[in-house]
UniProtKB/Swiss-Prot annotation:
Annotated function: Involved in transcription antitermination. Required for transcription of ribosomal RNA (rRNA) genes. Binds specifically to the boxA antiterminator sequence of the ribosomal RNA (rrn) operons.
Family named by the database record: Belongs to the NusB family.
Gene3D superfamilies for this protein: NusB-like (1.10.940.10)
Signal peptide: none
GO biological process terms, semicolon-separated: DNA-templated transcription termination; transcription antitermination
Source organism per UniProt: Shouchella clausii (strain KSM-K16)
Annotated Pfam families: NusB
GO terms for MF: RNA binding
Official protein name in the record: Transcription antitermination protein NusB
InterPro entries in UniProt: NusB-like_sf, NusB_fam, NusB_RsmB_TIM44
Amino acid sequence: MNRRVARLRAVQTLYQLTLIDINVDKAIENTLNDEEEPSEFYNTLVHGTLEHQDEIDGYLSENLKGYTLDRLGHVDRAIARMGLFEMLYLDDIPVNVTLNEAIELAKAFGGTDAGRFINGVLSNSYDMAMKNK
């Protein structure tokens, strides 16, 4: 599983967890194809995003102009949470690479406007987090 696929599967897993009251292991099982093995990167994205979700949600909430996190679409919320986790906690991946991958995921699911929205929210949230460190 390459990193692009891992990100896609992680978003799908996180999306499920916002919609259905199931545990993370069941969501992972539901997401992966029978022949797919979860990569270490995928596991890090899913579990790390969930572990730091409260902190991540705080930064995202501060930067959602005219929105609340609950009003944000489930897919956009999953992409934003995962993207910000990766930007803040996975130092081996350049921030601009993570940002671009999140934008591409958003555009694939929601079009160009979704990509612009994710770009703005993640950029501002990351900048705020860096000022607070």
